[in-house]
């Protein structure tokens, strides 16, 4: 099967069986579908919360430039837009998204939340194996002299 996403994230559009996701009779890579859905969420959020009179072509061109040309994660863009709306940042045009993603406070909050999320996942995934927690046992051979006798070669 071939990925039908216009901006496929892989060099070859071929989809291995384990990575194939079907939506509306179209085949996608898991990451491609996730990116497409995130971009749609960004468009919906912008339209509903920022401006209903936005020119969609301009909005999509700006989002595609950020995600595919600048290689900014679509999830980060969605997070940044939500944070900007929550803080009351004035967004007059889709081009403002370029500046929102560079906001120092938003970047720090994103890193803090990702670090907390990774820490939470690590705690959930770590299984306390009692045998791994026990100290290793060492055996000592008494065939050779110990202490200063071993250093000086004496018996």
Please annotate each region the language model reported.
Residues 3-8, 29-32:
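Short cysteine-rich clusters marking metal-coordination/redox-active sites
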Residues 1-5, 62-82, 123-125:
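Compositionally biased, low-hydrophobicity segments enriched in charged and small polar residues
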Residues 7-15, 36:
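Cys/His-rich microdomains that often coordinate metals
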Residues 75-136:
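Short, cationic/aromatic linear interface patches
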